[in-house]
Amino acid sequence: MKEASMPQTILATDLDGTFLGGNEAQRAALYEWIAQRRSEIVLIFVSGRGFDFMRQLARDLPVQPDHVIGDVGTSVATGADFAPIAAIDQWLDASWPADMAQQIDVIVRRHPELQPQPQHGGRRRSYFYRRPEPVQVAATELRRLGFDTLMSDNQYFDVLPRGVQKGSTLLRTLAALGLPEHRTLVAGDTLNDLSMFQTGLTGVAVSNREAALDHAITPHTNVYRSAQPGAAGVLDALQRFHQQGDFNGFISGHRLSQTTV
């Protein structure tokens, strides 16, 4: 792909609390800004939600995603018809052998404080919890078996294939689609977005971010802490990133340039 044909900005954004966060006016402002520059923006939804939710969302929103990463990074699709990306699916399938779910179930049955989420897809197992202490015991047992675990938003517990989360899947997706990392802005608000910030991609953590995420991103100078919530926080960073282009590493003290946009 020639540089002249490269998209100016790739926005890879979490949904709940981020792209869908804020009030109605803030969401409308973000969506209108993207719509006015639609040919310049590649929009990637990166969510813990599944494809059914995202298909409906794509029908309801005034802007639709070009690509989607769902189920905390364990499922990927491209285009309006949510077509699979063969190279990514092969990697995900290899990381999730047929007996993995059974192995997880054996451990989780010993921890009744973990309650299954009623609907989830992808290559994962997902649960609700109330108290973190007992869940940390289960997490230790599962990690010993070779799984990754993720606690977020003080209620969600995900068991994932080792090495598979939003961030790692996003990097593979960008590579598979020929999209440049240095033109990519990631956005999120909870701990299940941390792996996106850990990639080193330029990022924005919106103001309604989970306290645990705020603490976790402290060493990551690639992340801008927006003072705006949800969609307003995304727009706050997106306007600057889109205008200035490649400035990965430019952020100082977790702040994007304060240049008027």
Question: Predicted segment positions?
Answer:
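Short, structured coil segments at secondary-structure junctions
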Residues: 61-64, 72, 145, 199-200, ...
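Short, Lys/Arg-enriched N-terminal segments with co-localized hydrophobic residues
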Residues: 1-5
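Active-site phosphate-binding/coordination module
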Residues: 24-116, 208
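Conserved acidic, metal-coordinating active-site core of Asp-based
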Residues: 103-199
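Generic enzyme active-site microenvironment
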Residues: 12-14, 69, 187
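Asp-based phosphoryl-transfer active-site loop
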Residues: 7-24, 197
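Mg2+-dependent phosphoryl-transfer enzymes with acidic/Ser/Thr/Gly-rich catalytic loops
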Residues: 160, 167-261
